[in-house]
Amino acid sequence: MSDVPSAQGKAAALLARFDAARDAFLAAFAQAPDAALPYTPAGDEYALGVLPPHLQDTMNHYLDVYARMADAHYGPVDLAADPARAGREAERHRRLVVTKPTGADRAGLLGNLAATHQRVHERFAALDDATVARKADVIYSAGTDPYPTSVADIFGWLTDHYDEHSEQTGRLLAQWQSEGTQ
């Protein structure tokens, strides 16, 4: 028996890791009481409760990157060629920075995250290994060199992003508790 994955083995393995990272984030986020959701420690931009929509924005960003890669048939993609894109991203960032979710927002935040996570699943689940590994040169911002990007890379970044914010959630919660802000 070969260790070579099936035609869709690589996508399935990446999706499994992506799901596990999501589950770890959800477990960490579930530990945060509603009162902690608006907490923003000094030096941070985002409130604890903004992490789900922040994760969602990143997934939407990379779904768009992949759509552009596929539309270009894996030819070069220049995200900086869309001058309105930077403005939209800056506005989304600004909106997240000023958002201070409450417990009443929790179900909606998590529902939206689940829906976006599912869209990632639906978009990538049926891809074969060759497509998952295929790279396109993507210019992410003006003045930068193209970065060879594949679906496997995108999954790595999204999985790492969940992991980063799982750890951050624990740290923010501990900091919130130590400051006696509950």
Predicted regions and their residues:
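Short, helix-capping/interhelical loops that line the mouth of catalytic, cofactor-
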Residues: 1-13, 61-113, 176-182
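Long, hydrophobic/aromatic N-terminal blocks
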Residues: 1-34
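A structural signal for alpha-helical segments
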Residues: 6-9, 13, 39, 43-50, ...
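Alpha-helical transition-metal enzyme core signature, strongest for iron centers
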Residues: 18-25, 48-66, 85-94, 99, ...
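Short hydrophobic/aromatic segments of transmembrane alpha-helices and their interfaces
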Residues: 19, 34, 114, 147-148
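Helix-loop segments that flank and shape redox-cofactor active sites
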Residues: 24-49, 68-76, 128-146, 175-179
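Individual transmembrane alpha-helices with interfacial aromatic-anchor signatures
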Residues: 143-158
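Terminal "cap-and-tail" regions of soluble proteins that handle hydrophobic small molecules
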Residues: 150-153, 170-182
